[in-house]
Each structure stands twice: as C-alpha cells, then as structure tokens.
C-alpha cells in the first residue's frame, strides 16, 4: 500500500501472507499516480520514499536513485561489509512521518470485514479494500467540518 503525506491511499497490491514486501515494492511504485495540486497530469514519482527496515535492499535504493527519489529507509542491523564511498544518510525527522502509513493501516483495519479477512477470494477482499480506500478519500476531500 502506498499513501501520500495526508494518509490518502494512492495504490495497493494484494500478495500472499508469506511473500516478502520488497518483492512487490517496484511494481507498486511503477503504477502509482500522485495527484497534483494544480492542473495537469499526475506525477509518476514521489520525492521521498519512507519505508521500514524490511525494504532495505540495494536494488530498491538504486531504483530510487534512478528516478531521483530520496529513500528514507533505516539500515538493517545485520553484519554487513561496509561499501566503499560515502555512507547513505538517514533523515530521522523525515522518517518520523512514516507513522502516517501506520495510522492509515490502523484506520483500514477498523473496518471489521478487512481486519478479520472474512472474504475467501482475493478479488472480493481487494474490492473491499478499494471501497474502504474510496471512503477514506471521500471523507478527506468532502468533509463537513471544514
């Protein structure tokens, strides 16, 4: 699941529970369209990619470098040989904004049907996630409290 800085879901992919998240990161980043605040077509790439330690892979960092995205991913705490050159910088204040996606997942799981996974088929579960994300977008853009 990918969301913007306001917690609005942009796109998602369904995968098996045993599948690693890093395998689905690049296809998810390729299909995203970020709506722009002005007129014109939506952007295809984000400025920052905030992710947890599970996404710490060299091929994802190279992908971010190729498309001029700044990865804000903490390094895994495993024994690793230091690479030559400058070490990658880690922006801790920016990384604290990652709680936005965690709050969005918490909000999504408040929907009982999604949290308990009542649906047997992936197609019907994906439809319920799409419906919940649509409701989230509509509440954000058309709230009565504004």
Give residue spans per PLM region:
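Short, acidic, Ser/Thr-enriched surface-loop or helix-capping motifs
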Residues: 4
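Active-site beta-loop-alpha junctions of metal-dependent nucleic acid enzymes
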Residues: 13-38
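Residue-level signal for inorganic ion chemistry
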Residues: 25, 52, 131
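Helix-centered, glycine/charged polyanion-binding patches within enzymatic domains
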Residues: 36-121
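Membrane-interface transmembrane-helix boundary segments in multi-pass integral membrane proteins
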Residues: 121-125, 129
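Charged phosphate-binding loop/patch that engages nucleotide di/tri-phosphates or the phosphate backbone
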Residues: 128-146
């Amino acid at each position: 699941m990918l969301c913007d800085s306001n917690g609005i879901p942009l796109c998602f992919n369904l995968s098996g529970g045993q599948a690693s998240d890093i395998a689905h990161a690049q296809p998810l980043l390729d299909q995203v369209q970020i709506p722009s605040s002005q007129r014109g077509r939506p952007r295809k790439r984000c400025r920052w990619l905030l992710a947890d330690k599970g996404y710490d892979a060299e091929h994802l960092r190279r992908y971010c470098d190729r498309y001029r995205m700044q990865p804000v991913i903490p390094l895994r705490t495993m024994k690793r040989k230091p690479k030559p050159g400058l070490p990658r910088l880690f922006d801790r204040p920016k990384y604290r904004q990652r709680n936005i996606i965690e709050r969005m997942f918490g909000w999504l799981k408040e929907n009982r049907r999604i949290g308990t996974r009542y649906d047997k088929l992936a197609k019907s579960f994906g439809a319920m996630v799409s419906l919940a994300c649509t409701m989230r977008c509509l509440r954000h853009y058309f709230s009565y409290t504004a």
